[in-house]
C-alpha cells in the first residue's frame, strides 16, 4: 500500500514541477524583479532575519526568487553568510561561508557554489536562519523541491529556523508530502509573510529551546 502511495506522490510532484517551472520561465522579467524586491524587503524586515547572525541561503538561478540582495545586505550588516556546495559523488551538500558573491563559481547543475575550503565550512554555531529554495510551497510550509533530495537531507540534520521564498501564484493549498518531509517555519511571497509553524496542524516542525 505504501509503495503505491509513494509512487502516486512522486507522479503528482513530477507533474507539478513541470507546470511550475513552465509558469516561472514565462514570467515577465520586470514583474519578476518587482516581486523579488518585495519578497526581499519583507525578509530583511522580518524578525527571522534581524535576530539571526548566520544566514544560510541558496544562490538563485533565473527562475527562482533572487537572493543576491539578501546576500549583499547580510554581509553589509555584519552577518555571516554561507551558501551550499554539492558533495561530489553523493546527494549531500555542505554550506561554506563567503565574503563576496565573487567567490561563487558555476558548478553542479550550473548553479554558483563556494569553494570547498575546510576552514570555512558552516560550523553549526550562532543563531542561523536557512533560506530554503522551492518551486512551490503550501500554506503549512511543505515544499516542492527539484526532486534531487539535497535540501531534504540537509534539513533532516539542521535544527535552526527556516524560511521559504516563493511567488504567490506558485503556492498550493496542500502539497503531497511524506512523513520525513520537513516544512519551513516561515513562508514569504510578494503578498504576505505566513507563520507556518504557528498555524500548522500538530505543529510538525522542529522543536527548539
Regions found by a protein language model. Give the residues of each.
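Charged helix-capping and loop-helix junction motifs
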Residues: 72, 144-150
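Glycine-rich, N-terminal phosphate-binding loop of Rossmann-like dinucleotide-binding domains
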Residues: 59, 134, 191
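Receiver (REC) domain switch-region micro-motif
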Residues: 55, 130-131
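N-terminal active-site beta-alpha-beta segment that forms phosphate/nucleotide-binding
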Residues: 2-125
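Residue-level signal for inorganic ion chemistry
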Residues: 20, 81, 131, 147, ...
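Surface-exposed, charge/polar-rich loops and edge strands
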Residues: 2-11, 22, 115, 125-130, ...
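Short glycine-rich anion-binding loops that position phosphate/pyrophosphate groups of nucleotides
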Residues: 61-63, 135-139
